[in-house]
Amino acid sequence: MNKYRQPKVWGVFVGERGSQLAAFNTEYGPFPPKPNTDGYVAIGWAGIGDMLTYKNRYNAFRENFSIAYPDDNERVLSTQANMVWNFSYEILDGDYVVSPSSESGVLLVGQFTGEYLSDFNNHSTVAPSKTRKDLLHLRKVRWLAAIQDDDNRYGELNRIGQLTVSSLNITPERLVEIITNGEQ
């Protein structure tokens, strides 16, 4: 946990609308995972390469990102680049994650454990059943809760919008209160 700032809450889609969330979270049992089970969230943009290459080098990353993923709309380019950068370097050990899967009808809530991981060397070890081979940027997570879409808490927490990675407008205290108090 970072001693210099309070934990944040992040939203992460793993694949389109969370379609690959199950592939990264079945190593220790069936999906959805039980509380206190380890798993992963992952994002794409494999064309930028291993983000460890860019640690403390945002300008070099941004330049290479614009080459790998050109877009005439500077706002779109910046938004996409910042999602990858935030996933790799702004998310810290101890931050929280909300990760919905429309396909599975479940929303997972967890806490990040550790730093950014690159899966470029052997992409079959973490999620052998994934169908998108470009999901190579990883973060390890300790799952705290799995909330089904028929639970009232699902609607309250499934507000991460359309971005793959986003900082959510909810405090960690409120998030923990929601998941520990059962259905609201």
Question: What is each of the regions a protein language model found here?
Answer:
Residues 50, 54-139:
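Structured alpha/beta reader/binder surfaces that contact nucleic acids or chromatin modification marks
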